[in-house]
């Protein structure tokens, strides 16, 4: 009779099997993620060297995370606590909802057992850039731990200043700013209870991804003024939600009516210098454009806004001409790669060459998003 297989041997066998399964899983990496980063968190697989006790966000934790975020935002936006009397009320802060794609990317990164954030491009999704906060607890976490964490975040607001609301800078607390960022309205998180290989200690980690990302240098965290007075289109607030057969659960927050469409501003957008393209790419005359070369520009309406996308094959080239030059602003479009070229001289155009070696000889350009052009 053979001796029983020891527990360490079983663990090694299970780990080996897990690595094989993750190699198979990681072999599939959607093209958009590849274009953002060859180390995209969705695609890099998990760490086999850390022992995992639990993984994945439970239905209860999913609801709790959304509730805790919205409770904190509501207290600030609606001024419903003496602890935030020094901060202005918010006119445009959105109610957060759960996002499965953000959650899946966050879970993939959490499974790496890294105890640090991934890179911005590593977690980006097609609809928007993604912010991130990691909540970490020693040992096993319970519901009170998460409540206490958000209570400490709330108390930290006492040191958050009015001028920091008006303009985000490097000195602003980034976690507080991201939680309060008015235009961020989608959240998805990953959960892992594990032994960290670096010191052998047990931790519980919740990685939360936020979109559209906040903490944009020079921009306001939220717009100060009368509560809900600048709620964007496709949102409602308070009793106004009843006519849409919706219930406003959080005082002072603008609730998105159709979660498949973006909330878009009902006031003119103030240019910040961060725009790639200041145009909603709708059908208004001042947004019209013509294309020379590869005509694969596609208008996509997403939860992150309206995008004009193009995909170029090897050696492809496209030129897009926009009728109104005052709608254009430029930023570096593909850091680390060849940038598209703006040309002037009677025309306002964007010339985009394909770059070999980038995404397998492929290049994609997104021209973004923002409110529709105004007559």
Curated annotation (Swiss-Prot):
Keywords: Allergen, Disulfide bond, Glycoprotein, Secreted, Signal
PTM (free text): Contains 9 disulfide bonds.
Expression across tissues: Expressed by the venom gland.
Residues bearing glycans: 300, 366
Limits of the SCP domain: 66-210
Family per record: Belongs to the CRISP family. Venom allergen 5-like subfamily.
Tagged with keyword Glycoprotein: yes
Chief location of this protein within or outside the cell: secreted
InterPro entries assigned: CAP_dom, CAP_sf, CRISP-related, V5_allergen-like
Organism: Lycosa singoriensis (Wolf spider)
UniProt protein name: Venom allergen 5
Cellular compartment(s): Secreted
PANTHER family: CYSTEINE-RICH SECRETORY PROTEIN-RELATED
Signal peptide: 1-26
One Gene Ontology CC term in the entry: extracellular region
């Amino acid at each position: 009779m053979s001796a029983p297989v020891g527990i360490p041997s079983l663990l090694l066998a299970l780990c080996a099997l897990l690595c094989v399964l993750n190699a198979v899983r990681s072999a599939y990496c959607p093209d958009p993620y590849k274009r953002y980063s060859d180390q995209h968190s969705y695609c890099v697989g998990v760490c086999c060297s850390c022992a995992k006790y639990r993984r994945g966000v439970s239905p209860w934790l999913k609801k709790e995370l959304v509730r805790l975020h919205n409770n904190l935002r509501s207290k600030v936006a609606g001024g419903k606590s003496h602890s935030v009397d020094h901060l202005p009320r918010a006119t445009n802060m959105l109610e957060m909802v759960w996002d499965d794609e953000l959650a899946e990317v966050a879970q993939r990164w959490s499974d790496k057992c890294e105890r640090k954030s991934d890179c911005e491009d590593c977690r980006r999704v097609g609809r928007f850039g993604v912010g991130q906060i990691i909540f970490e607890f020693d040992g096993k976490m319970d519901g009170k731990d998460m409540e206490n964490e958000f209570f400490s975040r709330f108390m930290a607001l006492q040191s958050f200043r009015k001028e920091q609301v008006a303009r985000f800078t490097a000195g602003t607390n980034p976690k507080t700013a991201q939680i309060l960022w008015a235009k961020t309205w989608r959240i998805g998180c990953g959960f892992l209870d594990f032994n960290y290989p670096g010191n052998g200690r047990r931790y519980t980690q919740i990685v939360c991804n936020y979109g559209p990302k906040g903490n944009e240098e020079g921009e306001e965290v939220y717009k100060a003024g009368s509560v809900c007075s600048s709620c964007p289109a496709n949102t409602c607030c308070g009793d106004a939600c009843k006519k849409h057969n919706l219930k406003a659960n959080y005082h002072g927050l603008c609730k998105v009516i159709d979660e498949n469409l973006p909330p878009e501003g009902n006031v003119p957008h103030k240019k910040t210098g961060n725009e790639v393209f200041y145009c909603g790419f709708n059908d208004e005359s001042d947004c019209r454009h013509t294309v020379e070369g590869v005509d694969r520009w596609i208008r996509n309406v997403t939860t992150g806004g309206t995008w004009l996308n193009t995909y170029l094959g090897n050696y492809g080239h496209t030129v897009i001409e926009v009728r109104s030059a005052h709608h254009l602003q430029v930023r570096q479009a593909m850091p680390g790669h060849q940038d598209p070229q703006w040309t002037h001289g009677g025309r306002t155009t964007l010339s985009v060459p394909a770059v070999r070696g980038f995404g397998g000889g492929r290049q994609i350009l997104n021209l973004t998003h923002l409110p529709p052009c105004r007559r």
